[in-house]
Each structure stands twice: as C-alpha cells, then as structure tokens.
C-alpha cells in the first residue's frame, strides 16, 4: 500500500554507495520523513549489510526536505488499534534497530538540517558525529499525546546534566542546534549553507577513521554561543523543580517559581504540562528515573514493554486519544482517561513496567559479538505465535 502523499515509485529510504561511503537518505518529505514500518525495515537492512561489508568505511544519514525526521508515523498506530498487536512487529524492529545504531561498529555521521523529534532523533543523537544547523529543531513530545519517551531516550535523557532530562521528556520543550551541541546531544554546529559542501567532502574522504572525519567536520563547524534566553540558562530552576519526587510536586514547584521576576517563561510550559496526558506524564517520569540506573539494553527492553502495554490500552487509551486530537481530528482537545494526576493509580503505572511472564516475548538484545545481528523479529517468540 502506498503511503499517503508518497509517489509509489519513490523509495522511502534511499541507500547509495559512493566509493567507501554509504549515504542513507530518509525520503518522505511530505510527511516530514516520519518513520514508517518500511523505513525501519530498510534502515536495519542497510546498516547490517554495511557493517559486514569490508568496502564500507563511513555511513552518512540525512533527510529530504525541511525535516530530518519528525519521529514515528502516529497514524499507523492510530489506524491499527482495532487489530490486536498490529504494530508489534514495527515496534520490535525499531527498538532492535536503536540498539544497533547505538553500538554500530563503523563511523556514522548524521546531517540534521531541520526537524528531529522523538524516534527520528534516535537516528541522530547516538551517532559518532551528529551535525546540526540553525534550522535544527529537537523535541521529545510523547507525553503530550499519552505516549512515553522511547527509542532509547529514557537512556539518553537520564544522562543529561542535572534534571534536564526530566524537563525535556515531560514538557516536550524544543532545543535548537546550538543547544544540542552545548549538552552533548550533537557534536558539531555547521551553518546550513555549508552543509552540502561538508557532505561532498565527507563523501570524497575514502576514510572512516574517526579522527579524520572529525577534523573534516571541524573545517566547516562553528563554536556555539547560547542565546541569552536559552532554556539551558535556566538549569538551576529546572533542577530545583524537576528533581521533585512526583509529577504533581514538579508542577507545584514550577508554579511557585513562575511567580518570581524573570520567570515568565515558565507559565506557558506549565500550561503545556497541564494539557498533557496525566498517565503519560507519570509513565515518562518513572521511565527517566529508572533509566539512570539502567543499561542501554535494559532501557530499550523496558521501553518495548511500555509501548506494547500502551498500544494494548492496558491501563489507559490515552495514546489513541492524543493522536486523534493531534493528527486525526486536529481539535487539540483530548479527553484523557483518567483526567487528572490524582485519579491515575500508581499501582497501575507500576504494572506496565513489569517484566513479561515469558522471557521469549521480551525484546531480544544481542549482547555478544557472536550473536551481533541476532535477536531479529523473525526469530522472536512473537513471530512464531503470529506466523
């Protein structure tokens, strides 16, 4: 079935061999390069092929149009809700792919000149080199529509300075390219006007040596200076508020800070928090907090369980209601269930974090070199059950 607005003859991911360089282009510009099942499948196919290929030295990834990638294809989730576990395969494949991106054996460079959100940013942040521009916009807005911070971001956000991770995950606050470099979520800032020249230089390198690639990028990169009103200059307030034990306490502390001179920026952030799914907020906070003590593998396995429970409406249908309000009916008036933080049962929140009874249906992370590309969906407990 052709994707909406996509020419049936156009591949959603373009893989090109240019000497020893492999260039991957996300090619759904009308949909802001959102990650469809086919995108996940092709990316995994290319990355495995190229890691095993002795002729491949360097991997580049970019997006067509004004976005790098706006994240997962929410409409696929929404329209699959009436068929049990219809999205299970793509979810499994995506988290399995995230592990391999984080642990990839060859040098990868992401060229991010536009929107990079949610799962789309999972193709940016873990790379050896992530190049951003003045057009780059990053966010993890999942809590706003009843989902959770996934695709490895419970691992990434939990390792940011102070309690910035909780802030980004709960509020969906946006960061620009300079801010991403400042906190280590990107490695280099290059003006967008120089990006094509940088790409051409990287393609001509014939080297995957990290030092050579880094020095080449630095020929084009600029030192970053944060804007005066950058959210990163509010770190002390963020740490004070987002270190609180619960979402309710975080909001209360934030409201107290909002009344102080110079903190006018807080009011719209609070409004956004209060519009978000109460269930989603509680899941997100617990996931980030647990992530601080978990390995990458543990975080991805946990996120897989959370996603399946959310897709199955185990404790709430909020994700589907959030997607409806955001992208289907576009009324921006979701009716959350439960409607308030006080009504959300913490025991139910804990239940969606629990291990599955059968280890065969956990995400299978290949943690030994001998099994480096094992654990695929095809060999999982799900494939045998679903046929």
Swiss-Prot record:
Parts forming coiled coils: none
UniProt keywords, alphabetically: Acetylation, Hydrolase
Keyword Cell membrane: no
Domain of life: Eukaryota
Keyword flag Acetylation: yes
Enzyme class: hydrolase
GO molecular function, a single term: 3-hydroxyisobutyryl-CoA hydrolase activity
EC number: 3.1.2.-
Pfam families assigned: ECH_2
GO CC terms in record: cytosol; extracellular region
Residues found modified as N-acetylalanine: 2
Family (UniProt): Belongs to the enoyl-CoA hydratase/isomerase family.
Name of the protein in its database record: 3-hydroxyisobutyryl-CoA hydrolase-like protein 5
Annotated source species: Arabidopsis thaliana (Mouse-ear cress)
């Amino acid at each position: 079935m052709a994707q909406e607005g996509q020419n049936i003859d156009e591949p959603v991911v373009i893989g090109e061999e240019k000497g020893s360089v492999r260039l991957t282009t996300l090619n759904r510009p009308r949909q802001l390069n959102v990650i469809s099942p086919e995108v996940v499948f092709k990316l995994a196919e290319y990355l495995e092929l190229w890691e095993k290929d002795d002729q491949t030295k360097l991997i580049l990834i970019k997006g067509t149009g004004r976005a790098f990638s706006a994240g997962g294809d929410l409409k696929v989730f929404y329209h699959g809700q009436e068929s049990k576990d219809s999205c299970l395969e793509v979810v499994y494949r995506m988290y399995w792919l995230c592990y391999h991106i984080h642990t990839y054996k060859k040098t990868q460079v992401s060229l991010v000149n536009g929107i990079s959100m949610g799962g789309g940013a999972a193709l940016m942040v873990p790379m050896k080199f992530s190049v951003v521009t003045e057009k780059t916009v990053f966010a993890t807005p999942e809590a706003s529509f009843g989902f959770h911070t996934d695709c490895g971001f419970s691992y990434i956000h939990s390792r940011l300075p102070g309690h910035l991770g909780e802030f980004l995950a709960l509020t969906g606050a946006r960061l620009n390219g300079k801010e991403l470099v400042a906190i280590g979520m990107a490695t280099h800032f290059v003006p967008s006007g120089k990006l094509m020249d940088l790409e051409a230089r990287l393609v001509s390198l014939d080297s995957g040596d990290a030092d050579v690639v880094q020095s080449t990028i630095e020929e084009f990169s600029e030192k970053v200076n944060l804007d005066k009103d950058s959210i990163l200059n509010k770190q002390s307030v963020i740490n004070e508020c987002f270190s609180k034990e619960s979402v309710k306490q975080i909001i209360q502390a934030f409201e107290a800070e909002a009344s102080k001179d110079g903190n006018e920026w807080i009011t719209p952030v609070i409004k956004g928090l209060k519009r978000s799914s109460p269930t989603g907020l509680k899941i997100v906070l617990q996931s980030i907090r647990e992530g601080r003590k978990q390995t990458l593998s543990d975080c991805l396995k946990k996120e897989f369980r959370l996603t399946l429970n959310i897709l199955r409406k185990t404790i709430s249908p909020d994700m589907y209601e959030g997607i409806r309000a955001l992208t289907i009916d576009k009324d921006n008036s979701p009716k959350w269930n439960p409607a308030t933080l006080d009504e959300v049962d913490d025991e139910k929140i804990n239940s969606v974090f629990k291990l599955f009874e059968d280890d065969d249906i956990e995400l299978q992370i290949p943690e030994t070199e001998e099994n480096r590309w094992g654990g695929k969906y095809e060999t999982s407990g799900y494939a045998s059950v679903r046929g």
